[in-house]
Amino acid sequence: MNASSSSHSSNSSHSLHQTFSRDAIANSLTGKSVVTLDDISTAQIRMLLDKARYIDSHRKEVAHTCDGRVLATLFYEPSTRTRLSFETAMLRLGGKVIGFAGAQLSSASKGETVNDTLKVVSNYVDVVAMRHPKEGAAFVATQAVSTPIINAGDGGHMHPTQTLADLATILARFGRLNNLTVGLCGDLTYGRTVHSLIETLCRFGNVHFVLISPDELKTPQYVIDRINDTPSCTYEETRDLMEVIGGLDVLYMTRVQEERFTDREQYLRLRDTYILTEGKLQKAKSHMPVLHPLPRINEIAVDVDDDPRAAYFEQVKNGMLMRMALESSVLGDELCGYEPTDFVNVPEDELQAVDAHGISLADPRVHTTDENAPENLSCPNPRCITNSELTLKRKFYKAESDRHEYRCMYCDEEARA
Protein backbone atom coordinates (compact mmCIF):
# COMPACT_ATOMS: atom_id res chain seq x y z
CA MET A 1 0.00 0.00 0.00
CA ASN A 2 1.83 3.05 -1.15
CA ALA A 3 0.82 6.64 -1.29
CA SER A 4 3.92 7.94 -2.97
CA SER A 5 2.43 7.49 -6.39
CA SER A 6 3.24 9.95 -9.12
CA SER A 7 0.03 9.12 -10.98
CA HIS A 8 -2.99 10.26 -8.99
CA SER A 9 -6.37 8.83 -9.83
CA SER A 10 -9.08 6.81 -8.16
CA ASN A 11 -8.52 3.11 -7.58
CA SER A 12 -10.10 0.78 -10.12
CA SER A 13 -11.30 -2.76 -9.52
CA HIS A 14 -11.27 -3.78 -13.19
CA SER A 15 -8.24 -4.99 -15.08
CA LEU A 16 -6.80 -2.58 -17.60
CA HIS A 17 -4.83 -5.31 -19.35
CA GLN A 18 -7.83 -6.92 -20.98
CA THR A 19 -8.25 -3.84 -23.20
CA PHE A 20 -4.53 -3.21 -23.83
CA SER A 21 -2.91 -4.27 -27.06
CA ARG A 22 0.74 -5.22 -27.03
CA ASP A 23 1.71 -1.90 -28.61
CA ALA A 24 -0.39 -0.01 -26.09
CA ILE A 25 1.36 -1.69 -23.18
CA ALA A 26 4.77 -1.24 -24.80
CA ASN A 27 4.19 2.52 -25.03
CA SER A 28 2.21 3.00 -21.83
CA LEU A 29 5.18 4.03 -19.68
CA THR A 30 6.15 6.99 -21.86
CA GLY A 31 6.50 10.12 -19.73
CA LYS A 32 5.68 8.26 -16.51
CA SER A 33 7.40 8.67 -13.17
CA VAL A 34 8.11 5.62 -11.02
CA VAL A 35 8.26 6.36 -7.31
CA THR A 36 7.09 2.87 -6.42
CA LEU A 37 6.22 -0.13 -8.55
CA ASP A 38 2.65 0.47 -7.45
CA ASP A 39 2.74 3.24 -10.07
CA ILE A 40 2.65 0.67 -12.88
CA SER A 41 0.63 -2.42 -13.75
CA THR A 42 1.80 -6.00 -13.49
CA ALA A 43 1.64 -6.22 -17.31
CA GLN A 44 4.03 -3.26 -17.48
CA ILE A 45 6.34 -4.97 -14.99
CA ARG A 46 6.28 -8.10 -17.15
CA MET A 47 7.04 -5.92 -20.18
CA LEU A 48 10.13 -4.48 -18.45
CA LEU A 49 11.31 -7.98 -17.56
CA ASP A 50 10.81 -9.00 -21.18
CA LYS A 51 12.69 -5.95 -22.49
CA ALA A 52 15.59 -6.61 -20.12
CA ARG A 53 15.96 -10.15 -21.49
CA TYR A 54 16.00 -8.75 -25.02
CA ILE A 55 18.57 -6.08 -24.14
CA ASP A 56 20.89 -8.67 -22.61
CA SER A 57 21.14 -10.55 -25.89
CA HIS A 58 21.03 -7.54 -28.23
CA ARG A 59 23.55 -5.07 -26.80
CA LYS A 60 24.66 -3.74 -30.21
CA GLU A 61 21.13 -3.36 -31.51
CA VAL A 62 20.05 -1.16 -28.57
CA ALA A 63 23.23 0.92 -28.37
CA HIS A 64 21.62 3.98 -29.98
CA THR A 65 18.16 3.73 -28.44
CA CYS A 66 18.55 6.92 -26.39
CA ASP A 67 20.81 8.96 -28.67
CA GLY A 68 20.53 12.63 -27.74
CA ARG A 69 18.92 11.94 -24.37
CA VAL A 70 20.31 13.18 -21.05
CA LEU A 71 19.81 11.52 -17.66
CA ALA A 72 20.34 13.41 -14.40
CA THR A 73 21.47 11.32 -11.43
CA LEU A 74 20.71 13.36 -8.33
CA PHE A 75 22.17 11.35 -5.46
CA TYR A 76 21.86 13.16 -2.15
CA GLU A 77 23.41 10.23 -0.29
CA PRO A 78 26.22 7.78 -1.09
CA SER A 79 25.76 5.04 -3.66
CA THR A 80 28.02 2.86 -5.75
CA ARG A 81 25.91 0.21 -7.47
CA THR A 82 22.68 2.12 -7.98
CA ARG A 83 24.24 5.33 -9.30
CA LEU A 84 26.73 3.57 -11.57
CA SER A 85 23.98 1.22 -12.73
CA PHE A 86 21.68 4.08 -13.73
CA GLU A 87 24.53 5.89 -15.46
CA THR A 88 25.84 2.81 -17.26
CA ALA A 89 22.32 1.98 -18.38
CA MET A 90 21.93 5.35 -20.09
CA LEU A 91 25.42 5.26 -21.59
CA ARG A 92 24.83 1.79 -23.03
CA LEU A 93 21.64 3.11 -24.63
CA GLY A 94 23.56 5.93 -26.30
CA GLY A 95 22.56 8.76 -23.99
CA LYS A 96 24.53 11.06 -21.71
CA VAL A 97 24.58 11.65 -17.97
CA ILE A 98 24.93 14.65 -15.66
CA GLY A 99 24.44 14.85 -11.92
CA PHE A 100 26.00 14.83 -8.49
CA ALA A 101 26.92 12.24 -5.89
CA GLY A 102 26.46 13.68 -2.42
CA ALA A 103 24.33 16.55 -1.16
CA GLN A 104 27.50 18.46 -0.28
CA LEU A 105 28.23 18.72 -4.00
CA SER A 106 24.90 20.38 -4.78
CA SER A 107 23.02 23.52 -3.79
CA ALA A 108 21.23 21.42 -1.19
CA SER A 109 24.23 22.24 1.00
CA LYS A 110 23.12 25.87 0.73
CA GLY A 111 19.57 25.04 1.71
CA GLU A 112 17.95 24.59 -1.71
CA THR A 113 14.78 22.51 -1.58
CA VAL A 114 14.11 19.39 -3.63
CA ASN A 115 11.33 21.28 -5.40
CA ASP A 116 13.66 24.07 -6.56
CA THR A 117 16.48 21.71 -7.53
CA LEU A 118 14.14 19.71 -9.76
CA LYS A 119 12.67 22.79 -11.38
CA VAL A 120 16.20 23.82 -12.35
CA VAL A 121 17.55 20.42 -13.42
CA SER A 122 14.46 19.51 -15.44
CA ASN A 123 15.42 22.24 -17.92
CA TYR A 124 18.61 20.34 -18.75
CA VAL A 125 17.54 16.71 -18.97
CA ASP A 126 14.98 14.22 -20.25
CA VAL A 127 14.75 11.94 -17.20
CA VAL A 128 15.88 12.06 -13.56
CA ALA A 129 17.03 9.29 -11.22
CA MET A 130 17.03 10.56 -7.64
CA ARG A 131 18.19 9.14 -4.33
CA HIS A 132 17.52 11.05 -1.13
CA PRO A 133 17.80 10.26 2.58
CA LYS A 134 14.33 11.65 3.32
CA GLU A 135 11.28 9.48 2.79
CA GLY A 136 8.90 10.98 0.27
CA ALA A 137 11.54 13.03 -1.55
CA ALA A 138 10.88 11.32 -4.88
CA PHE A 139 7.17 12.05 -4.53
CA VAL A 140 8.02 15.73 -4.01
CA ALA A 141 10.05 15.65 -7.22
CA THR A 142 7.13 14.28 -9.22
CA GLN A 143 4.93 17.10 -7.95
CA ALA A 144 7.48 19.73 -8.96
CA VAL A 145 8.07 18.86 -12.64
CA SER A 146 6.64 16.89 -15.55
CA THR A 147 10.00 15.28 -16.40
CA PRO A 148 9.92 11.53 -15.61
CA ILE A 149 11.34 10.84 -12.14
CA ILE A 150 12.71 7.42 -11.21
CA ASN A 151 13.06 6.82 -7.49
CA ALA A 152 16.54 5.46 -6.77
CA GLY A 153 15.71 5.14 -3.06
CA ASP A 154 14.03 7.56 -0.65
CA GLY A 155 15.31 6.99 2.86
CA GLY A 156 14.01 3.75 4.33
CA HIS A 157 10.84 3.93 2.26
CA MET A 158 10.99 2.46 -1.27
CA HIS A 159 13.51 1.33 -3.91
CA PRO A 160 11.54 0.25 -7.01
CA THR A 161 14.44 -0.34 -9.40
CA GLN A 162 16.15 -2.67 -6.94
CA THR A 163 12.90 -4.60 -6.82
CA LEU A 164 12.95 -4.88 -10.61
CA ALA A 165 16.42 -6.42 -10.30
CA ASP A 166 15.14 -8.75 -7.59
CA LEU A 167 12.17 -9.84 -9.70
CA ALA A 168 14.41 -10.53 -12.70
CA THR A 169 16.69 -12.66 -10.53
CA ILE A 170 13.84 -14.65 -8.96
CA LEU A 171 12.20 -15.14 -12.36
CA ALA A 172 15.46 -16.43 -13.85
CA ARG A 173 15.81 -18.97 -11.03
CA PHE A 174 12.20 -20.19 -10.81
CA GLY A 175 10.42 -19.12 -13.99
CA ARG A 176 7.68 -17.57 -11.85
CA LEU A 177 7.07 -14.83 -9.28
CA ASN A 178 4.47 -16.59 -7.15
CA ASN A 179 3.87 -19.84 -5.27
CA LEU A 180 7.01 -19.12 -3.27
CA THR A 181 8.10 -18.92 0.36
CA VAL A 182 10.30 -15.84 0.62
CA GLY A 183 12.43 -15.13 3.68
CA LEU A 184 13.54 -11.56 4.33
CA CYS A 185 16.23 -11.23 6.96
CA GLY A 186 17.91 -8.40 8.82
CA ASP A 187 16.88 -4.75 8.88
CA LEU A 188 13.22 -4.86 7.93
CA THR A 189 12.41 -1.46 9.44
CA TYR A 190 14.66 0.73 7.32
CA GLY A 191 15.21 -1.75 4.49
CA ARG A 192 13.52 0.05 1.59
CA THR A 193 14.38 -2.83 -0.75
CA VAL A 194 12.42 -5.18 1.51
CA HIS A 195 9.37 -2.90 1.55
CA SER A 196 9.35 -2.56 -2.24
CA LEU A 197 9.80 -6.29 -2.82
CA ILE A 198 7.02 -7.32 -0.43
CA GLU A 199 4.53 -4.86 -1.88
CA THR A 200 5.29 -5.94 -5.45
CA LEU A 201 5.26 -9.70 -4.81
CA CYS A 202 1.87 -9.28 -3.13
CA ARG A 203 0.52 -8.17 -6.50
CA PHE A 204 1.60 -11.43 -8.12
CA GLY A 205 0.02 -13.34 -5.26
CA ASN A 206 0.45 -16.69 -3.54
CA VAL A 207 3.56 -15.78 -1.59
CA HIS A 208 4.31 -16.68 2.02
CA PHE A 209 6.66 -14.16 3.60
CA VAL A 210 8.92 -15.14 6.48
CA LEU A 211 10.02 -11.92 8.19
CA ILE A 212 13.23 -12.53 10.14
CA SER A 213 14.49 -9.70 12.32
CA PRO A 214 15.19 -8.59 15.87
CA ASP A 215 12.24 -6.90 17.57
CA GLU A 216 13.89 -3.51 17.09
CA LEU A 217 13.95 -3.87 13.29
CA LYS A 218 10.55 -5.35 12.47
CA THR A 219 8.61 -4.67 9.29
CA PRO A 220 6.62 -1.38 9.28
CA GLN A 221 2.89 -1.64 9.76
CA TYR A 222 2.00 -0.24 6.33
CA VAL A 223 3.91 -3.13 4.73
CA ILE A 224 2.26 -5.68 7.03
CA ASP A 225 -1.10 -4.16 6.12
CA ARG A 226 -0.33 -4.80 2.47
CA ILE A 227 0.24 -8.51 3.13
CA ASN A 228 -2.91 -8.70 5.23
CA ASP A 229 -4.87 -7.00 2.46
CA THR A 230 -3.80 -9.66 -0.06
CA PRO A 231 -5.96 -12.78 0.45
CA SER A 232 -3.49 -15.13 -1.27
CA CYS A 233 -0.46 -13.92 0.74
CA THR A 234 0.53 -14.76 4.30
CA TYR A 235 3.38 -14.00 6.65
CA GLU A 236 5.07 -15.04 9.85
CA GLU A 237 7.60 -13.19 11.99
CA THR A 238 10.55 -14.75 13.77
CA ARG A 239 13.92 -13.83 15.25
CA ASP A 240 15.53 -17.17 14.39
CA LEU A 241 16.87 -17.60 10.85
CA MET A 242 18.04 -21.17 11.38
CA GLU A 243 14.61 -22.22 12.59
CA VAL A 244 13.04 -21.37 9.23
CA ILE A 245 15.82 -21.52 6.61
CA GLY A 246 14.99 -25.09 5.58
CA GLY A 247 11.52 -24.10 4.38
CA LEU A 248 12.51 -21.11 2.26
CA ASP A 249 12.50 -20.94 -1.53
CA VAL A 250 14.24 -17.54 -1.52
CA LEU A 251 16.36 -15.87 1.17
CA TYR A 252 16.76 -12.10 0.95
CA MET A 253 19.49 -10.86 3.28
CA THR A 254 19.94 -7.20 4.21
CA ARG A 255 22.53 -5.26 6.14
CA VAL A 256 21.75 -3.32 9.30
CA GLN A 257 22.06 0.24 8.02
CA GLU A 258 24.22 2.38 10.27
CA GLU A 259 23.18 5.57 8.48
CA ARG A 260 19.53 5.11 9.54
CA PHE A 261 20.31 4.90 13.28
CA THR A 262 20.38 7.83 15.68
CA ASP A 263 21.63 5.60 18.51
CA ARG A 264 25.06 4.20 17.67
CA GLU A 265 25.04 1.80 20.62
CA GLN A 266 21.85 0.23 19.31
CA TYR A 267 23.41 -0.14 15.86
CA LEU A 268 26.51 -1.84 17.28
CA ARG A 269 24.34 -4.20 19.29
CA LEU A 270 22.21 -5.21 16.29
CA ARG A 271 24.59 -5.19 13.33
CA ASP A 272 25.85 -8.76 13.71
CA THR A 273 22.51 -10.35 14.57
CA TYR A 274 22.50 -12.44 11.39
CA ILE A 275 25.59 -13.76 9.61
CA LEU A 276 24.94 -16.27 6.84
CA THR A 277 27.74 -18.79 6.34
CA GLU A 278 28.26 -21.75 4.03
CA GLY A 279 27.75 -24.02 7.02
CA LYS A 280 24.34 -22.54 7.75
CA LEU A 281 23.35 -22.98 4.11
CA GLN A 282 23.66 -26.74 4.54
CA LYS A 283 20.21 -26.65 6.15
CA ALA A 284 18.68 -24.77 3.20
CA LYS A 285 17.12 -26.15 0.03
CA SER A 286 19.60 -26.91 -2.73
CA HIS A 287 17.85 -24.49 -5.11
CA MET A 288 17.28 -21.61 -2.64
CA PRO A 289 18.87 -18.44 -4.09
CA VAL A 290 20.44 -16.00 -1.66
CA LEU A 291 19.70 -12.40 -2.62
CA HIS A 292 21.13 -9.20 -1.17
CA PRO A 293 20.74 -5.61 -2.43
CA LEU A 294 24.36 -4.84 -1.49
CA PRO A 295 26.55 -3.49 -0.10
CA ARG A 296 27.08 -6.28 2.38
CA ILE A 297 29.12 -5.77 5.51
CA ASN A 298 29.46 -9.14 7.21
CA GLU A 299 25.90 -10.50 7.09
CA ILE A 300 26.94 -12.88 4.29
CA ALA A 301 30.31 -14.57 4.74
CA VAL A 302 32.67 -14.53 1.77
CA ASP A 303 32.64 -18.34 1.66
CA VAL A 304 29.03 -18.17 0.43
CA ASP A 305 30.11 -16.40 -2.79
CA ASP A 306 31.18 -19.64 -4.46
CA ASP A 307 27.92 -21.41 -3.63
CA PRO A 308 25.69 -21.70 -6.73
CA ARG A 309 22.84 -20.38 -4.60
CA ALA A 310 24.58 -17.00 -4.22
CA ALA A 311 22.60 -14.70 -6.52
CA TYR A 312 23.56 -11.22 -5.34
CA PHE A 313 26.03 -10.49 -8.13
CA GLU A 314 23.42 -11.67 -10.63
CA GLN A 315 21.17 -9.00 -9.14
CA VAL A 316 23.76 -6.35 -10.03
CA LYS A 317 23.73 -7.31 -13.71
CA ASN A 318 19.96 -7.62 -13.73
CA GLY A 319 19.68 -4.19 -12.12
CA MET A 320 21.53 -2.55 -15.01
CA LEU A 321 19.41 -4.38 -17.59
CA MET A 322 16.15 -3.48 -15.85
CA ARG A 323 17.21 0.17 -15.61
CA MET A 324 18.00 0.15 -19.32
CA ALA A 325 14.51 -1.19 -19.94
CA LEU A 326 12.91 1.37 -17.62
CA GLU A 327 14.85 4.41 -18.83
CA SER A 328 14.09 3.71 -22.48
CA SER A 329 10.44 3.01 -21.66
CA VAL A 330 9.71 6.21 -19.74
CA LEU A 331 11.40 8.15 -22.55
CA GLY A 332 9.31 6.37 -25.16
CA ASP A 333 12.43 5.30 -27.07
CA GLU A 334 11.90 2.02 -28.91
CA LEU A 335 14.49 -0.74 -28.70
CA CYS A 336 15.69 -1.58 -32.20
CA GLY A 337 14.32 -4.96 -33.26
CA TYR A 338 12.33 -5.56 -30.08
CA GLU A 339 8.99 -7.31 -30.39
CA PRO A 340 6.92 -8.06 -27.28
CA THR A 341 6.75 -11.78 -26.59
CA ASP A 342 4.44 -13.29 -24.02
CA PHE A 343 4.47 -10.63 -21.32
CA VAL A 344 0.90 -9.64 -22.17
CA ASN A 345 -0.28 -13.18 -21.56
CA VAL A 346 -0.76 -12.45 -17.90
CA PRO A 347 -2.20 -15.45 -16.03
CA GLU A 348 -5.94 -15.17 -15.59
CA ASP A 349 -5.70 -15.49 -11.81
CA GLU A 350 -3.33 -12.53 -11.77
CA LEU A 351 -5.75 -10.47 -13.86
CA GLN A 352 -8.65 -11.28 -11.58
CA ALA A 353 -6.84 -10.98 -8.25
CA VAL A 354 -8.18 -8.35 -5.88
CA ASP A 355 -7.25 -7.41 -2.35
CA ALA A 356 -9.47 -7.65 0.69
CA HIS A 357 -11.14 -4.37 -0.32
CA GLY A 358 -11.91 -5.45 -3.88
CA ILE A 359 -9.09 -3.41 -5.44
CA SER A 360 -7.31 -4.91 -8.45
CA LEU A 361 -3.80 -6.10 -7.68
CA ALA A 362 -2.82 -6.09 -11.36
CA ASP A 363 -3.57 -2.44 -12.09
CA PRO A 364 -1.51 0.51 -10.86
CA ARG A 365 -2.35 1.14 -7.22
CA VAL A 366 -2.72 4.84 -6.59
CA HIS A 367 -4.04 7.04 -3.84
CA THR A 368 -5.51 10.51 -3.90
CA THR A 369 -5.16 13.20 -1.29
CA ASP A 370 -8.21 13.30 0.95
CA GLU A 371 -9.17 16.95 0.93
CA ASN A 372 -11.51 16.30 3.85
CA ALA A 373 -8.78 14.97 6.13
CA PRO A 374 -8.78 16.66 9.56
CA GLU A 375 -6.71 19.84 9.53
CA ASN A 376 -4.86 18.90 12.71
CA LEU A 377 -3.19 15.81 11.19
CA SER A 378 0.58 15.58 11.02
CA CYS A 379 3.15 12.96 10.05
CA PRO A 380 5.03 11.63 13.10
CA ASN A 381 7.82 10.12 11.00
CA PRO A 382 11.03 12.10 11.68
CA ARG A 383 12.48 10.74 8.42
CA CYS A 384 9.62 12.12 6.31
CA ILE A 385 10.62 15.02 4.08
CA THR A 386 7.63 17.04 5.30
CA ASN A 387 9.33 17.29 8.69
CA SER A 388 12.49 18.85 7.24
CA GLU A 389 11.21 20.89 4.29
CA LEU A 390 8.52 22.69 6.25
CA THR A 391 7.10 24.62 3.29
CA LEU A 392 5.69 21.42 1.81
CA LYS A 393 1.94 21.03 2.03
CA ARG A 394 0.90 18.15 4.28
CA LYS A 395 -1.12 15.58 2.36
CA PHE A 396 -2.92 12.50 3.64
CA TYR A 397 -4.93 9.64 2.19
CA LYS A 398 -7.44 7.36 3.85
CA ALA A 399 -6.12 3.82 4.13
CA GLU A 400 -8.24 0.98 2.81
CA SER A 401 -7.96 -0.99 6.05
CA ASP A 402 -10.93 -1.41 8.33
CA ARG A 403 -9.37 0.98 10.82
CA HIS A 404 -9.98 3.91 8.45
CA GLU A 405 -6.83 5.66 9.52
CA TYR A 406 -5.14 8.39 7.50
CA ARG A 407 -1.63 7.94 6.15
CA CYS A 408 0.97 10.41 4.93
CA MET A 409 1.02 10.74 1.13
CA TYR A 410 4.80 11.13 1.21
CA CYS A 411 5.98 8.27 3.42
CA ASP A 412 2.89 6.10 4.16
CA GLU A 413 3.22 6.42 7.92
CA GLU A 414 0.01 6.60 9.93
CA ALA A 415 -0.92 10.22 10.60
CA ARG A 416 -1.41 11.59 14.09
CA ALA A 417 -3.75 14.28 15.32
Residue ranges and their predicted role:
Residues 287-288, 293-345:
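Adenosine-phosphate binding glycine-rich loop
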Residues 64-171, 298-301:
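Phosphate/diphosphate ligand-binding glycine-rich loop within oxidoreductases
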Residues 76-89, 171-253, 402-414:
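Glycine-rich phosphate/diphosphate-binding loop of Rossmann-like nucleotide-binding domains
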Residues 147, 205-207, 283-289:
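A short helix->loop->beta-strand "cap" motif at the edges of active sites that frequently abuts
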Residues 366-417:
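Cys/His-clustered metal-coordination modules, chiefly Zn-binding fingers
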Residues 2-4, 13-84, 88:
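Positively charged, low-complexity intrinsically disordered leader regions
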Residues 227-304, 309:
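Rossmann-like adenosine-cofactor binding region
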